[in-house]
Amino acid sequence: MSEEDKSKKLEELLKLLKVHDGDLSKFTSQQRKDMNEYKFWKTQPVTKFDEVIKKEGPIDSSKRPEDIPDTPLPLLGDFEWCTVDVNDEKQLEDVYVLLNENYVEDKDSTFRFNYSRDFLNWGLKPPGWKEEWQVGVRVKETKRLVGFISAIPTNLQVRGNDVRSVEINFLCVHKKLRSKRLAPILIKEVTRRVNKYDIWQALHTGGVVLPSPVSSCRYAHRPLNWSKLYDVEFTALPANATKTQMIAKYTLPKTPISNIKLMEERHVDEAFELFNKYQQRFELRPNFDKEEFRHWILTREDVVYSYIIENDEGKVTDFVSFYSLPFTIINNPLYKDLGIGYMFYYASDADFGYDRFSAEGTERLRKRLNLLINDACILARNLKMDVFNALTSQDNALFLEDLKFGPGDGFLNFYLFNYRCFPITGGIKEDQTFDVEKRSNVGVVLL
């Protein structure tokens, strides 16, 4: 395969990482369609493109749970609704098979997401989860699961306002049924079920531009095992560079530089307090209680990893977490999988007591985050991860370039359903480069 072909292959593979072609400066001319072309979304309570927002808050606040039908919309005759009991191993296996065979795959069928059962248990069952919010569509005759969507409860803070909502995720329709327009019906059905609990807002993300993003962040990628990435044709050799040079460029120390260590149950109280104080700087953020924080952050082997740094007095001053979502490599004689780490939540007290954007506060935080995230990359590499991904959300712009994260080819858009909101900075400038000065005001991270 030529280097040009490898470059094209890389562009295709990046889409697997939720990196879709997206150019913030060209949304209007390239990705954004006329509102009338959004046959489904034009009927929903979402902010229209170019809508002048005068006040933040719910778009439609007139409905009550008793106004919502007790029965779902009818499906085509060959299909039936189901509630997926993810506590049942067989039903969880159905979700596992559907996602791993249909969620995302490159055109050559070389790489495929490998959602583990442990990952699904973590992502689908946080505190307060509802079985009836795990919505499926099955073939009547065979009972095969061919469609799925999940909602999980989340309390958001949107510029200081508490917004009781859900996160929508894992929307998946079998690849052979994409023409049946099951996705809009799945969205309507999970909305109906959530509305019955008197919840009217939702947060979701995607690479496709819909009406209307509240924020857009860019992906960045840090090779941890460049040699393997090259061997499996996940990355190309840049012009005027040798393999030896590329391997040397991305080589990390064998062990962390700081006294970082695995977060344990005994650290949760301090880390939770640190997290809440740190997150207050962001305009779109989760409002976790301690049980939710414990669920999402404490280490689960092969799923999520969290680490803390303590000062000389034993106080937790920093924590960092990342989750693992590998690819299966199909028909490769050398490798069966590709390890991928995703930046999750972190916090540091480095700039506490300073204005967030002051020169001194910024420099203190930049230095601390460079140490913290570099150690996270080392730990991820030692866990056999081959690439580390991060968005430009949170304060990530302070370390991305310094730590050799390369800008990805696409963007992740954040959407609030049934909620008007002024735009929130996503950590990128108009020319799409990392915005170290303004950074991002998006604090929430979705799987």
From Swiss-Prot:
Residue sites binding tetradecanoyl-CoA per the record: 38-41, 171-173, 179-183
GO molecular function, one term: glycylpeptide N-tetradecanoyltransferase activity
Alphabetical keyword list: Acyltransferase, Cytoplasm, Transferase
Intracellular or extracellular location(s): Cytoplasm
InterPro entries: Acyl_CoA_acyltransferase, NMT, NMT_C, NMT_CS, NMT_N
Subunit record text: Monomer.
Name of the protein in question: Glycylpeptide N-tetradecanoyltransferase
